[in-house]
């Protein structure tokens, strides 16, 4: 279609993996598709094939009615003709050029007046005023990233391709730039494909997430749906669902399903009315812990167990609880101290029925 990018291609490596990219992206409006997955899942390969930097083995890529690649027809449009903006993971700034020089390098071939005007626009847009004469080594990580973005945007590309755009930044800078980048992408109105393995980044930037694993696209959808309702156990593991256990539906009451998980009874919302064997997915932040065995919550699922591990993770702690199966909870480090959580501590884990996602198996 003329108002979207479609891609269905495979890249095979001799004696190596095969990467299969199947993507669809609306064009002509701001839309960010995030390719999310672990290292080696094929994210950057897909990005490079979209850019024309690598040639797929088979398949087709089309953008707004223009064929960029067609293996059968022998079509391979050059990267320049695709009019894309590609932000490399390391930014690839020229160390010998100033900020202004890096930006205007992308504007070669246009008149001097138009070049200067566009450079001023980008310096203002990316908050780089006053830094024009500095070289990359004199800039902070966040400033370098903004210069790289300015250079990528200089030619008003039809499509933006961002390869791990925030990975080179320290944590505090990454948090600040993340919000700036989201606003910039929406403000520019350029369709974007962004690669990341950071789920916080994916949630912050994406209109849509494509989860990759083993060289193929496993699930595509809105970020809240993909991260809270993974399509299968493989996706659940990739997006970081901490507890994935096998169970069986043994009873149904209205839209609720009773499940047996190794002798433990749990209730889950099951609006689709599926039955039989399934996986239960429970995110750690949906588990509440109380000391003792007398729960105060009205939630349906109260599981008596004992703490087997308390693992600090920055401002929070991951707590493993043996309750017939291993359930992971996420609590603040202060809460872990207040509750005196340690291996052997008896606790009750509480999980709402609506927080348990079921996947048929």
Residue ranges and their predicted role:
Residues 51:
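Helix-to-loop junction immediately C-terminal to a conserved catalytic motif
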Residues 33-34, 76-78, 82-92, 193:
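ABC nucleotide-binding domain signature
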Residues 2-6, 10-29, 72-76, 111, ...:
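A short, flexible loop at the N-terminus of ABC-type nucleotide-binding domains that lies
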């Amino acid at each position: 279609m003329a108002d979207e990018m479609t891609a269905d291609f495979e890249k095979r490596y001799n004696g190596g993996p095969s990467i299969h990219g199947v993507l669809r992206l609306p064009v002509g409006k701001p839309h960010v598709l995030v390719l999310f997955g672990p290292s080696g899942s094929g994210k950057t390969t897909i990005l490079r094939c979209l850019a024309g930097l690598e040639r797929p083995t088979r398949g087709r890529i089309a953008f707004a009615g223009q064929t960029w690649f067609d293996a059968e027809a022998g079509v391979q449009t050059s990267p320049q003709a695709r009019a894309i903006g590609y932000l490399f993971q390391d930014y690839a700034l020229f160390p010998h050029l100033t900020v202004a020089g890096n930006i205007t390098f992308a504007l070669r071939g246009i008149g001097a007046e138009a070049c200067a005007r566009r450079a001023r626009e980008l310096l203002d847009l990316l908050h780089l005023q006053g830094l024009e004469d500095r070289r990359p080594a004199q800039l902070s990580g966040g400033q370098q990233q903004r210069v790289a973005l300015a250079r990528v945007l200089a030619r008003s590309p039809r499509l933006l391709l961002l390869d791990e755009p925030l990975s080179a930044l320290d944590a505090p800078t990454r948090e600040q730039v993340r919000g700036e980048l989201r606003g910039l992408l929406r403000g520019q109105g350029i369709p974007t494909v962004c690669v990341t393995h950071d789920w916080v980044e994916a949630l912050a930037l994406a209109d849509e997430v494509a989860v990759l694993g083993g060289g193929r696209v496993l699930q595509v959808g809105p970020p809240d749906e993909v991260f809270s309702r993974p399509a299968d156990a493989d996706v659940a593991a990739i997006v970081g669902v901490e507890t994935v256990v096998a169970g069986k539906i043994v009873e149904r009451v209205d839209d609720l399903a009773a499940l047996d998980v190794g002798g433990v009874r749990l209730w889950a919302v099951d609006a689709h009315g599926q039955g039989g064997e399934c996986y239960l997915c429970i995110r750690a932040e949906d588990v509440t812990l109380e000391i003792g065995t007398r729960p105060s919550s009205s939630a349906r699922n109260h599981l008596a167990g004992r703490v087997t591990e308390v693992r600090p993770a920055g401002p929070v702690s991951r707590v493993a609880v043996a309750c017939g199966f291993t359930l992971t909870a996420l609590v603040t480090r202060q809460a872990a101290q207040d509750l005196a959580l340690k291996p052997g501590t008896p606790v009750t884990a509480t999980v709402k029925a609506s927080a348990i996602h079921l996947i048929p198996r």
